Design a protein with these regions (language model features):
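Bacterial N-terminal signal peptides that target proteins for export
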Residues: 1-9
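C-terminal motif of bacterial Sec signal peptides marking the signal peptidase cleavage site
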Residues: 17-19
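An exposed, glycine/acidic-rich loop-and-rim segment of catalytic or binding clefts
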Residues: 21-58, 64-380
């Protein structure tokens, strides 16, 4: 969910090369990434690139800067390995070109209206960074911070975020974890958990930008999309949810019967006009069942498919509306409009101000848990 955010990126970043001797001879990854370009320091914390592999030859690269998925290599219908996510070649690029590419978003994914909500009678005031609202935790959200990273084995990396009380003005000392596991069935299993010492709100997600053609020069409008949802939470002109549920019956944004994305981009639809495309929270029919299909995307040229499963009540689908050709990503490729799709599993936007929606409040003694699976396959 990327918009023309006026992100004030005043991180005071200190970059310092760390030529770790044990990695001096490390080769590039299958996706062509140089791990040395991810070894540095940001605000005094070390960053690196973790590489996960399975027996099928699939490879996933993750950096602890923002908990980001940097590359995903999967086979197409002819057995050719393709990188199916957008991203950058180095930590320097992630810092100098602020974006949400591949990030583990926190504390609160999506928007909080006017950066304010009331918790136990006290008004919490957050920094705003998007049309007067707080988006993805604010201008210094976790996507711009360094997680502590530990690779447990060839297929799992475990990330930890220690977020102090007052981090981006959110209350409570929060300890959060993100566990990425590459499974033998070519799925990426993402588990989030968090605890706090003071009542707070939390809503985490992964913000990968998918292009299943393996070439971000190609638009995603011919990709066939299915979403298991009867309604969306509509937005106003500032992309803020209105608090309503909008039925998708007779709406171009209805993907209960799989169809090309282009067929959902009816510019006469007011919701599409607001976002210059789809950038909406779909209310899932899965009722928190991780075994039920939430969404599916298929690229006709490569045959690569992506299935999404989650225990969350919603999924934000974003069709790359504000990719505008001003950002150059991995391997020098320019990212133009509609060259990626995001599938962000989540609680609904602005839930702290919408008591009628599932709660995002986390209290001491409780554990926040969220689960998402990205499963890749091939359709010939």
């Amino acid at each position: 969910m990327k918009t023309k955010s006026k992100v004030l990126f005043g991180m005071g970043v200190c970059l310092m090369a760390m030529a770790c001797q044990q990695n001096a001879g490390q080769k590039t990854t299958l996706s062509g990434l140089d791990p040395m370009k991810f070894q540095t320091e940001v605000n005094g914390k070390s960053t690196q690139l973790f590489t996960l592999k399975n027996a099928n030859g699939m490879e996933v690269c993750i950096t602890n800067f923002g908990g980001r998925i940097v590359s995903i290599m999967v086979p197409d219908k002819n057995g050719k390995m393709e990188d199916v996510v957008l991203g950058f070649d180095s930590i320097a690029d992630y810092i100098n070109k602020p974006s949400d590419f591949g990030a583990a978003i926190g504390r609160y994914a999506n928007r909080i209206q006017k950066g304010r909500f009331v918790l136990d009678g006290d008004t919490v005031k957050l920094p705003t960074n998007n049309f007067g609202h707080c988006l993805h935790g604010g201008p210094k959200g976790w996507q711009y911070q360094v997680y502590e990273g530990k690779q447990l084995n060839d297929s799992t990396v475990y990330l930890t975020m220690q977020s102090p009380d007052g981090d981006n003005q959110f209350p409570g000392n929060v300890t959060a974890h993100v566990t990425y596991t590459l499974k033998s069935n070519n799925s990426i299993d993402i588990k989030y958990d968090a605890t706090t010492d003071k009542k707070t709100v939390i809503n985490m997600t992964n913000h990968s930008y998918f292009n299943l053609s393996g070439n971000p020069k190609n638009a995603i409008t011919d990709n066939v999309l299915y979403i298991n949802a009867d309604s969306i939470t509509p937005v106003d002109s500032t992309f803020m949810t209105t608090g309503e549920m909008l039925s998708l019956n007779g709406n171009s944004m209805d993907f209960r019967n799989a169809k090309p994305i282009s067929e959902g981009l009816d510019m006469n639809n007011q919701q599409i006009k607001f976002g210059k495309g789809i950038d909406h929270n779909y209310v899932l029919n899965t009722k928190g069942d991780i075994n039920k299909l939430a969404a599916k995307l298929v690229c006709p040229s490569t045959g690569i498919s992506l299935e999404v499963y989650t225990n969350e009540p919603g999924i934000q689908v974003y069709t790359g509306n504000f990719l505008d050709g001003t950002t150059t990503g991995k391997h020098g490729i320019v990212y133009n409009q509609r060259t990626a799709v995001c599938m962000e599993t989540q609680h609904y936007p602005d839930s702290p101000n919408k008591p009628q929606w599932p709660s995002v409040i986390l209290a001491p003694g409780q554990t926040y848990q969220s689960h998402c699976i990205f499963k890749f396959g091939v359709e010939k």
